[in-house]
Regions:
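Solvent-exposed, flexible loop/coil segments flanking beta-strands in beta-rich domains
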Residues: 2-75, 223
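Noncatalytic modules at the cell exterior or secretory-pathway interfaces
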Residues: 34-40, 181-193
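Edge beta-strands of jelly-roll/beta-sandwich modules across compartments, strongly enriched
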Residues: 50, 200-207
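Conserved small/polar residues in nucleotide/adenosyl-binding loops
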Residues: 211-216
Length: 223
């Protein structure tokens, strides 16, 4: 069920055509052209990153968790994993991975899930669904609330129990760890730098992340 294929990237951050540090709790939306590479770097360690993707040719064809899991016969993602859309279309391939534990089942925290899982007073805490909604409200892309679907939680440690349930455990990432993926189609990336304080997925201390596109040659070729 679980196999970690650790691989370092051949690309250098100093060659990036784009980089941005995102503070804890914020959302981020960015277009990635086919052939470009995208890296998420965990600056301080143990930070969960709620992420989903959309096919820019058909934004309704968003990342599909079931299609991705079934095609690779594995619930976890690592080097070589193909992230697929609902149609089955390959959107991205993970080309480098330094943690090997990326959740495909836990989904994004929300006001409703915080209330059910933790306590009624938690309903007012900022959450990943809020971050997603704020990004969608500002985008000019044809992506709406209806297009939110189960997402990937990069760096998030969600073991499956013997009974078939799942739990949120301490993260396995560390400062400087990263995951890198190459776009197999033109995609829109939607991210929430998870603000969760009620479970150990962020070590109860949400922190900053670095997003880069360290692929100048591919970028130039796609323009």
């Amino acid at each position: 069920m679980y196999g970690f294929i650790e691989k370092d990237s051949d690309l250098k951050i100093e060659d990036a055509v784009y980089d941005e540090v995102l503070n804890a709790g914020l959302g981020w939306m960015h277009e990635l052209k086919k052939g470009q590479t995208f890296r998420i770097l965990d600056i301080e360690g143990n930070q969960a990153v709620d992420t989903t993707f959309y096919d820019l040719e058909n934004p309704e064809d968003h990342y599909g968790a079931v299609q991705t899991i079934v095609a690779q016969k594995n619930i976890y993602l690592t080097t070589g994993s193909i992230l697929r859309a609902e149609s089955g279309k390959p959107l991205l391939e993970i080309t480098a991975d330094k943690t090997g534990r990326h959740d495909t089942l836990g989904g994004a925290c929300s006001s409703q899930s915080n209330t059910v899982r933790y306590a009624r007073e938690k309903r007012y805490m900022h959450n990943c669904r809020d971050s997603f909604m704020l990004q969608l409200a500002d985008t000019t892309a044809d992506i709406k609330k209806r297009d939110l679907a189960p997402n990937i939680n990069f760096f998030m440690n969600v073991p499956i129990t013997k009974e078939g349930g799942y739990k949120f455990d301490d993260g396995v990432s560390a400062p400087g760890k990263y995951v890198e993926m190459k776009a197999l189609a033109d995609v829109m990336i939607l991210i929430s730098n998870c603000p969760q304080l009620n479970n150990p997925c962020n070590a109860y201390n949400p922190t900053c992340l670095l997003y880069t596109s360290p692929s100048p040659r591919d970028y130039a070729a796609s323009r």
